[in-house]
């Protein structure tokens, strides 16, 4: 930690979040589930050829899953040779792709779904009625008994286009029934690591408070204080958006925008609701940063004296997946973009902080819980507590979100700089 002694730390706050998690010893579930086989590939739009990001990738009949990265690429590991993968994304027809035996990466092309004219009549529906009915049906649509999820979490910070901080963790998430609040939902870290830029010129670093407890605090269907409650929804103007599909299932799309002026920023966004079950399946939110002072108070937890903070963007994506008659949390991603400068300096510097977590496996009948003493506190940060390591095989045997090309280059750069010291 000596190289970080002169750094100035900027601390930003995720919605609903207090802190990252503290380190812990590995749970017994850890190394016993190391996965030996893998399939690698990319997902593209069949018409445009554009790579598709944050696409759900799973093994049919199994519970292993991941998402594509922002380059549209994925690696999915299993305990036996995979025969095919199932790929699904909002607005596209789902597709099963056969895994080749030669080990070459797959290129999977998804066809955009064409909504029939008769289905556009959904525009006449009442958005508030859909949301209130969906809230009443949460107890029927989501898990009714505790489950244990294996997750992968990553947080990064970039100064302009350069990565200055990377932290990752494999976690266990104990998720209780949606008829209860999240007081018993807990996370324990199986394995984690931290990578930092060793350059002394990186005098400003970013600490994101949020971390692996992401999947507890930002499960918006369970934690309704944030958005999905009648008092909060009354603050928004709503209208029906164009319908779409997720996992080959028709979805209502409800568009939100701030409807009143209050002493805190509200969101623009879309809420997706399964047309048949009325389960929430996807929530996209973007913070209204038009009032810079309010947005700064909302986003920023702590900053050094003399530093000027300019919020640019804060977005949140929460995905749920329908399977075997039950809808479950599958992926959460939060992105901060902001600029900082010091007083009396002419130019400012742009920063981006990203946190994401994906559920990669689940146990529907766990034999144990995560005890309170094993659970991670929400008052710490991986920035402070995760071990610093540059082991190239650190995640061997675990499902993770495949690093993007730019992230891989950043890690390789850190390897080289570390070896030169």
Task: Label each residue range with its predicted role.
Residues 28-38:
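Beta-strand-rich domain onsets/edges
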Residues 224-275, 279-286, 321:
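Extended beta-strand-rich segments in extracellular/periplasmic secretory proteins, especially
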Residues 49, 75-82:
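Short Pro-Gly-centered beta-turn/loop motif in secreted/extracellular proteins
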Residues 37-45, 72, 108, 120:
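A short, amphipathic beta-strand motif
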Residues 63-73:
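Short, acidic Ser/Thr/Gly-rich low-complexity loop/linker segments typical of extracellular
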Residues 59, 86-97:
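A short, solvent-exposed loop/turn motif at the edges and junctions
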Residues 109-236, 247-250, 299-300, 305-421:
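Surface-exposed, low-complexity/disordered segments
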Residues 37-39, 46-61:
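Short, ordered, surface-exposed loop/turn motifs in non-cytosolic proteins
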């Amino acid at each position: 930690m000596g190289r970080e002694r002169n750094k100035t730390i900027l601390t930003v706050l995720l919605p609903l979040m207090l802190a990252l998690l503290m380190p812990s010893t590995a749970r017994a579930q850890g190394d016993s589930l190391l996965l030996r086989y893998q399939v690698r590939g990319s997902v593209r739009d069949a018409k445009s050829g554009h790579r598709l990001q944050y696409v759900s990738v799973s093994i049919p009949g199994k519970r292993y899953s991941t998402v594509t990265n922002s380059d549209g690429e994925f690696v999915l590991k299993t305990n036996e040779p995979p025969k095919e993968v199932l790929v699904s994304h909002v607005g596209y027809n789902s597709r099963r792709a056969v895994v080749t035996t030669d080990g070459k990466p797959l290129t999977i092309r998804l066809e955009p779904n064409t909504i029939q004219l008769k289905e556009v009549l959904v525009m006449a529906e009442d958005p508030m009625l859909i949301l209130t009915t969906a809230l009443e049906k949460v107890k029927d649509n989501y898990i009714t008994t505790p489950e244990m999820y294996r997750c992968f979490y990553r947080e990064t910070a970039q100064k302009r286009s350069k990565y200055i901080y990377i932290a990752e963790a494999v976690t266990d998430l104990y998720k209780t029934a949606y008829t209860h609040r999240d007081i018993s939902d807990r996370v324990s870290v199986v394995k984690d690591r931290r990578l930092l830029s060793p350059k002394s010129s990186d005098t400003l670093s970013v600490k994101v408070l949020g971390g692996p407890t992401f999947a507890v605090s930002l499960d918006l269907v369970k934690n309704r204080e944030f958005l999905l409650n009648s008092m909060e929804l009354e603050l928004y103007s709503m209208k029906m958006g164009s319908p779409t599909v997720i996992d080959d299932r028709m979805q209502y799309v409800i568009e939100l925008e701030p409807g009143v002026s209050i002493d805190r920023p509200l969101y623009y966004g879309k809420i997706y609701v399964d047309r048949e079950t009325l389960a929430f399946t996807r929530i996209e939110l973007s913070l209204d940063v038009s009032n810079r002072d309010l947005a700064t108070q909302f986003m920023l937890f702590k900053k050094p004296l003399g530093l000027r903070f300019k919020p640019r963007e804060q977005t949140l994506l929460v995905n749920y997946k329908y399977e075997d008659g039950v809808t479950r949390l599958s992926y959460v991603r939060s992105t901060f973009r902001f600029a900082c400068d010091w007083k009396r300096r002419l130019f400012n510097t742009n920063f981006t902080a990203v946190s994401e977590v994906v559920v990669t496996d689940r146990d529907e009948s766990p034999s144990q819980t995560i005890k309170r003493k094993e659970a991670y506190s929400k008052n710490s940060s991986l920035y402070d507590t995760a071990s610093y390591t540059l082991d190239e095989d650190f995640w061997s045997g675990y499902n993770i979100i495949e690093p993007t090309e730019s992230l891989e280059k950043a890690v390789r750069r850190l390897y080289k700089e570390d070896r030169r010291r």
